[in-house]
Amino acid sequence: TRVRSSAASDVYKRQIITCPCFVGMYFLAEKIAALIYNAPGAADAIQTMSVGILLLGLHQISTGILQGLGRTSIPVINMILAAAVKVFLSWTLTAIPTLGIKGAAMATVVDFGLAAVLNMIFIYKYTGFALSFSGVFKPAVSAAAMGAAVYGVITLAVSWGAWAILAAIAVAVPVYGGVLLAVGGMGKDDLESLPFIGHRLLAAGQKLGYFR
């Protein structure tokens, strides 16, 4: 149906953005912790929170889909339930000495994930749409290639400090975009829907002969 197709398209476009953000934050966690917080030991918590990027993205887009279907109360209820679980887990996990602040990060990830899963259950109920492996394969492969490139950069530039982050980002963006285009993970419609840079990327692709 049209609603199911629209939901699938919206979720896919969100994954195009969240997959590389998750991978980038995971591999750059130690650098970010040292630069922003002056606390390299917080890297584990940041890596844990990086998973939340994927789940938060899914939660946000699934909330929008349910609101578009006129089921505005459902995501609110799901968010309240997930928040209650987060409070319990935060209280429990942070009390474990071996976890500490990482326990709070884990509780937040569960919060995002539970709210997203509950939303997706209702989306399936009303539209028949469900997440599939094929729907995340291309962004995941592209993000994995990007992750390998980022890891290589931060390994070689280990003594560069903050510049290592900038170097990694400078390499990550073209690698992710190039692989995503190479595997057919982004079409003209996908590019046009991206805010701010979509039309510019499409114009560049047309000049290079990738898009007609």
Which functions belong to the PLM regions below?
Residues 1-8, 12:
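Single conserved hydrophobic/aromatic residue that forms the stacking wall/gate
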Residues 10-13, 19, 54-61, 80-88, ...:
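Hydrophobic alpha-helical transmembrane bundles that constitute the permease/transmembrane domains
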Residues 25-54:
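Interfacial segments at transmembrane-helix termini and the short loops linking adjacent helices
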Residues 28-33, 37-39, 94-98, 127, ...:
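Short helix-capping/hinge motifs at transmembrane helix termini and TM-loop junctions
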Residues 47, 51-81, 91-92:
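Membrane-interface junctions at transmembrane-helix termini in multi-pass inner-membrane proteins
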Residues 62-70, 120-135, 186-189:
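Alpha-helical transmembrane segments
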Residues 70-76, 83-121, 148, 152-173, ...:
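Membrane-interface helix-loop junctions in multi-pass transport and translocation proteins
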Residues 151-212:
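Membrane-proximal transmembrane or re-entrant/amphipathic helices at the cytosolic face
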